[in-house]
Amino acid sequence: YFAPSKRIPVETTAEPTQSETAAPDRNDAARSAFQRALRTVHDDLRWPELPDSGNIEVWEPGTIEDEQFAVTDVDGDGEEELLVSVSNTYMAGMCEIIYGYDPQTDGVRIESHSYVGVTHYPGMLKVEASHNQGYAGDILWPYAIAYYDEAEDSYKDAFYVDAWCKDITDYDSYTETPYPDDIDTEHDGYVYLITENGERRFMNRADYEKWEAGIFTNKEPLTIPWQKITTANIDALVK
């Protein structure tokens, strides 16, 4: 389960070049399973494979047919996945789920469950936080990084990225930590926080930019072929 508790927008200076997702051989068994899953979403307003919190509530006058799905190889494993995104709902209900086909059950299984602010990269997801209620201010919109684990056929949390602006506070009462002036060697007035495996570390701007380049250099966002969750589009998956 991959669901950071925060929200969207990042500043970019230019539109990134987007690469197309791979075009795997069509698997009609998988598509039939995706079709059944989408009918559960469309007809029953339920998320498949989420028995405890599976109800979908769409705010009127919108309907489920205003929400989106895509069938494409998003994780790069050579097989198609089903992506379903619901955003016209209460904040906690906004989510995107990536489903893979499970040939053992002839059904679907969840590869990723996250907030809707997702940018897809080959083998990687960047998920914008749903809120920015910490100390980041305008420096950064918090985000998480997850990597595709081929052995597990699912995405695994890797990093959570936040920032701390000294103008907002010079003391974190939650962790009882003073602002790390020793890290902010350029006196920018802010530092970045990288959480990995439950361990948080601070970085100054120069170190963060190097770290960020290591994550994103040579990675282009994938173009996801989104379409509306309509009966016609669902029926067209398998003819």
Specify the residue positions occupied by each region the protein language model found:
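Acidic, small-residue rich beta-repeat scaffolds with periodic aromatic anchors
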Residues: P4, I8-P9, A23-T40, S130-K239
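Ser/Thr-rich, Proline-interspersed low-complexity disordered segments
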Residues: T13-T21
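Blade-edge motifs of beta-propeller repeat domains
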Residues: A23-T63, T105-G117, T230-A232
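Beta-propeller blade termini
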Residues: E65-V74, V116-K126
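Acidic/hydrophobic-patterned starts of short beta strands in beta-sheet-rich repeat architectures
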Residues: G76-V86, G123-H131
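Short, solvent-exposed loop/turn segments at conserved positions within beta-propeller repeat blades
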Residues: Y90-M94, G137-L140
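Beta-propeller blade repeat segments, especially FG-GAP/WD-type strand-to-loop junctions
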Residues: G93-E111, A146-E150
